[in-house]
């Protein structure tokens, strides 16, 4: 016999946060690449049979915009309505603090992960998250340097993903 529960679609909504670095060091072309990849991810997520709740956070050293996405038409409209906000320095910790506030308030109840599209220049959080965290970079995995010559160090607890011209959405 097949249990009734085996026929039910799960009601749990998967939640994903996509952060897009709009700081001054991210040139317009790079931000457009972030948008293209974000669009590809969102369309892929929506193709699953279950509901999704995605938040796109545009940020530099502060939260510039927080856009909730729950429907296919919103996914297609997002790049059309995008305009760069911010353009200051990057502090990744701002997004992580903001996500914690959303979780504590109940706005994010089942966070599966956070993808942060960035050039890598900025202040990283020291404390590991209890959800999967991926920093997405364009180019190869050659260690990047700050303007003062220091190697940029992504926290060990975060996944580093490098997208080349061949792997872009």
Task: State each model region's role.
Residues 1-17, 24-29:
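Acidic, polar low-complexity linker/tail segments
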Residues 14, 24-57, 130:
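…and closely analogous acidic/polar surface helices at protein-protein or active-site interfaces
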């Amino acid at each position: 016999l097949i249990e009734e529960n085996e026929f039910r679609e799960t009601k749990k909504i998967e939640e994903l946060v996509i952060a897009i670095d709009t700081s001054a060091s991210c040139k317009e072309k790079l931000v457009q690449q972030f948008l293209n990849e974000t669009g590809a991810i969102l369309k892929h997520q929506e193709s699953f049979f279950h509901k999704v709740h995605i938040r796109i956070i545009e940020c530099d050293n502060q939260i510039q915009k927080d856009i909730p996405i729950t429907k296919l038409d919103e996914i297609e409209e997002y790049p059309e309505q995008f305009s760069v906000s911010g353009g200051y320095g990057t502090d990744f910790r701002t997004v992580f603090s903001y996500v914690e506030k959303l979780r504590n308030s109940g706005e994010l109840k089942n966070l599966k992960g956070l993808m942060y599209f960035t050039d890598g220049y900025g202040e990283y959080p020291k404390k590991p998250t209890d959800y999967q965290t991926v920093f997405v970079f364009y180019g190869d995995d050659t260690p990047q340097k700050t303007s003062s010559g220091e190697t940029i160090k992504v926290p060990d607890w975060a996944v580093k993903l490098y997208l080349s011209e061949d792997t872009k959405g």
